[in-house]
Amino acid sequence: MAKKVLIISSSPLKGGNSDLLCDEFMKGALEAGNEVEKIVLKDKTVHPCTGCSVCSMYGKPCPQKDDAAEIVEKMIAADVIVMATPVYFYTMCGQMKVMIDRCCARYTEITNKEFYFIIAAAENDKAMMERTIDGFRGFLDCLEGPQEKGTVYGIGAWTVSYTHLRAHETEADL
């Protein structure tokens, strides 16, 4: 049965290493017969959470007028969510963290999803990249029924669009 797959790419560079891995993931998901949409955060306007508590204290929609609400709506509708980030100082990039924070208003509706992570870093040691994965897992810990299905590690990706990007992925099938 086809799944609705949402890929969220937080690479600040079109064609950056994590973005290229998103495209490869997308290709495989489409070949498997899934419906796939890729959102590139750099092409969207997503402001940081202001901590106003309108959503958490009063149950009202976030008052900010940007693209975050639309992205969260797509996360709620998806069966599979792929979160992709370059690794900066052993953690996810700011664009991804801002998007995660903006899920606050509706995170209780992001339920029973399959999650994949894509990370690309200059680091050659996968163990050093685990802090980034831990950040994603912190988000998943707040959701109901998430299933972490796999991680694609783009290691040794120091330069933009590194042509010899070595991707190591866990066993994961969509």
How would you name each of these model-derived features?
Residues 3-32:
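N-terminal beta1-alpha1 ligand-phosphate binding loop
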Residues 9, 40, 152-153:
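Residue-level recognition of beta-strand->loop/alpha-helix junctions
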Residues 35-44:
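A short beta-strand-loop structural module common to alpha/beta enzyme folds
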Residues 45-69:
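Cysteine-cluster motifs in flexible loop/terminal segments that predominantly coordinate metals
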Residues 63-143:
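Helix-loop-strand module that forms the ligand-binding subsite of alpha/beta enzymes
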Residues 141-154:
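A charged, well-structured terminal subsegment
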Residues 163-170:
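Conserved small/polar residues in nucleotide/adenosyl-binding loops
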